[in-house]
């Protein structure tokens, strides 16, 4: 059986998660990407590197054409935020299990997500969509408000602005970097930030738990740490699931970010119709002790999920980012490592290599690496992460 996997840049989710899972399932994998050299380099260490073909994956017509000229597909899949709609359309073209492309579009397009949830009467967030070049002076948002690229990721160019002057300045700065991108200006949804991780086969849906997310101080929204939450309060989960149902989310993994307000109301921040990233999906699989990546691939092959996943309970997980606090060249950092000590499994993965120079983004793009740990004792898990951070050093030279 052949799996076509669509990707932009290489990610740990694919390299460490989905490709090994595909190998365990006996699948032949063809990676379609617009960055073939980067993927071939990323997969050199794998026992069975996949076939990598260059393709304009942002255009579903190019995907359909290439697959039609190559081997017959059994599944078309992507874990990229940017490629869910294209993947859904290509899979549907070949009559394969597919996400509803409308749901994929609603999740990716933050303005459309707001409009749809308001139209079905589930949640109304005051939001304005700004087309490229559209004057900011003509809108009247509630301050403070959040400005974000309509189809952005990784908190990039997202900021909280306090007044009209800050709004104009931030929009102008973003448009210098990405002049062709539409923006969304929306009311600030205050509350503690959480995630809900779900897995569905189109009929049955499992809630895998979620995370409590610590973010950086305003005006930016950088995810600094995530702690596993086995079960959110049932009324909160029901509200989030109702909104996912209204959006049409059903097949595969979904990572939803939301806040809970003092009155218990759950307000969605964004829906990422794929597995959670930045090593959290790998941590989740280890934490729950389930073949998470295999389950995701199986549903895209048309197989139903089991009634019970057999997830391990009573464990704690802690994911912590190591962030650059300035621009410069990374001149010292620990290597990738993994070990178990005193009942705690700890993993560290670098996101930058020593010698790389980067600007300071003030987003998740500033991650130098991620350390995570899982175990039965929360204090031991948290302590292992703190001990690792204290024992290692990351140096940036301007």
What does each of the following model-derived ranges do?
Residues 67-73, 139-141, 177-179:
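Glycine-rich phosphate-binding loop signature in dinucleotide/nucleotide-binding domains
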Residues 92-157, 162-164:
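A conserved helix-loop-beta module that forms one wall/lid of the active-site cleft
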Residues 136, 297-398:
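Peripheral (often C-terminal) accessory segments that flank ATP-dependent C-N-forming ligase machineries
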Residues 5, 234-255, 262, 272-331:
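Active-site "cap" helix and flanking loop/linker of ATP-utilizing ligase/carboxylase catalytic domains
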Residues 158-266:
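Internal nucleotide-binding/catalytic subdomain
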Residues 1-103, 324, 352-359, 363-366, ...:
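ATP-binding N-terminal substructure of ATP-dependent carboxylate-amine bond-forming enzymes
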Residues 159, 187, 285, 368-375:
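Short, well-ordered beta-strand elements within core beta-sheets of diverse protein domains
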